[in-house]
Amino acid sequence: AILSRLVVDERTLVSDVCHRLLDLAWEDYRVKCLNEEPRGSTGRGITPAYLDEVGQWQITYADFLGGANYFARKLTQRAERAIRTIQHVCQVSEETWKSFFTKLTEAELRANAEAIELGILKKEDVDFLQFMGEKPFTLNIARIIEVYWNAGKSLSKNIGEVRELILKEMLAGHTIIGEFGQAYWLDKRHGYSPNVTASHTYTPEIFESAGIPVQRVHTFGVAKAYDTKVGTHTFITEMDGSHPLAIKLKQIEFGTSTGRQRMVGWYDAIEKGDALRYGGFQDLMINKLDALTYSGAWNGELLICTAYQDSAGKLYKHVPRNEVIRKSLKPVYTAYPGWSEDISGARKFADLPVAARRYVAAMVKSLLEVAYADQTWPKDLPNLRYLGVGPLPSQIIKDVPPALELIKLA
């Protein structure tokens, strides 16, 4: 059913095991050769894949529509470049080289545990040891070519020109939905280097990626009712690991594609407000409000970060662009009472406990105060269109009052 509706643009980049090995190798180089903190890479090969695009070494899905020999030549060249880089530039040891394949296998087994349990995938499908050569710093290139060529050819009927498809649908009056899998603060230019991805992660990129003219779009800002990060980020609002809410949230917070444990923290209105101020969005969605319901000894107090403060007492109402400064800051919190009621069945805003409604209002008000600072607020404010109270599509509250009315509850 999915394949009948799927179109992969012919210019889509092909990322493979070479990129993933390079990702791990550069992380090893950063730590062992440069004596720096790890970047916290997912190990998915994203940055090396984009480096190939910038360097004009890319392999695209269009290559699956050509001959096998041409594809094999390009992938062989990529593999040889990767091996030389890993061995001679990154100076990876033989022991570490071998560990990469085990590490990638373990990561995929963890990320695909549910699919394997359901029989959708087999364990051998995610076994990266099959790509390791017999000698150190060699690859089973024939096997790599076979696996990736067969995978690409299986999608050959789904490869097409997405930009024409989008333009056709737009001319027919249909709505096009584009989704960014990462946040504004992971944008390669606007985020916190080196803890960023290799692409642009907010609205302007939709035109570049889709290949369509710049035009008016309606952007939704999407956030959780608390904060999470994964990797080695400086996390100003990170919760103490022993806090009852942190313990609870860590049971549900794992990377979608990697299965990695996420760090959890209090809602950071400074980051959200600056994402609105500099990134821009017309409406807001907040999910996982239900995860904040308290029980047990904890009294349910919730914190919202409304400013940062340095050691001299100076307050910051925006995220500093200087990472040295940002790393030195502490959060300034405003506390709000929590609630113990189960809100997963609420479908109307009025169904929520008073404390939950006030907390929601405070999240919206605090980010608006950051975004618009001392300027005159615009007439049309971003409204909270959807409020998630559970993982199911039906567990969404859609009647939240308009922003001007909502923030009066804070």
Pin down the residues of each PLM region.
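Non-transmembrane, aqueous-exposed alpha-helical and coiled segments at domain scale
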Residues: 1-410
